[in-house]
Amino acid sequence: MFDRPTILDEAFSRRVAAHDFPDSRNNAASQSFAPHVLVDLFDSQIMSRHLDLWARRSKGKTFYSIGSSGHEGTAAMAAATRTTDMAFLHYRDAAFLIQRKKQAGGLTPLHDMALSFAASADDPISGGRHKVLGCAHTFVPPQTSTIASHLPKAVGAAHSLGMAQRLQLADAVLPHDAIILCSFG
């Protein structure tokens, strides 16, 4: 049987083991991120990809929808923002959520996402209703696979930032200098 994800994963592993890397015009020293940050981002991207592979292998034992492969770069968006910057995510942005939860510390992104894939009642964001990306602790409202239903929510959240400043709310949930992120596609 032709299994493209496994073929790609094995080819990648062989090239890394052989130190067979493509030539690059950039290097870690020329980047604005420290090398350990780049490794951490790569780790989040690999975690996201391996969650997809795990879910494919668990077919029939877990709930599974479209994977996050191809959206691994969103981990960089998470690294470039704060855990208090609200993020309304595309349903395939698992790498963002993994990186955001790692930044917050004390959270278990892979365990939580496995619970979500299995529609477990112990899933901390959906309680077993569906594969959902989200985390209350890191200001990522839950988002299922409904296409673009989170866009109006993101606009409302962004509007609320200005309102909170104009009203000089001392107990606003988000910091006064927060930004609202929204990914879609």
Whereabouts are the PLM-identified features?
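Cofactor-binding active-site loop characterized by glycine-rich and histidine/acidic residues
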Residues: 53-185
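Positively charged, low-complexity intrinsically disordered leader regions
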Residues: 30-45
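Charged, compositionally biased N-terminal leader segments and the immediate start
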Residues: 1-32
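N-terminal glycine-rich anion-binding loops that anchor highly charged ligand groups
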Residues: 43-54
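Membrane-targeting and insertion segments and their boundary/processing signals
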Residues: 12, 25, 29, 48, ...
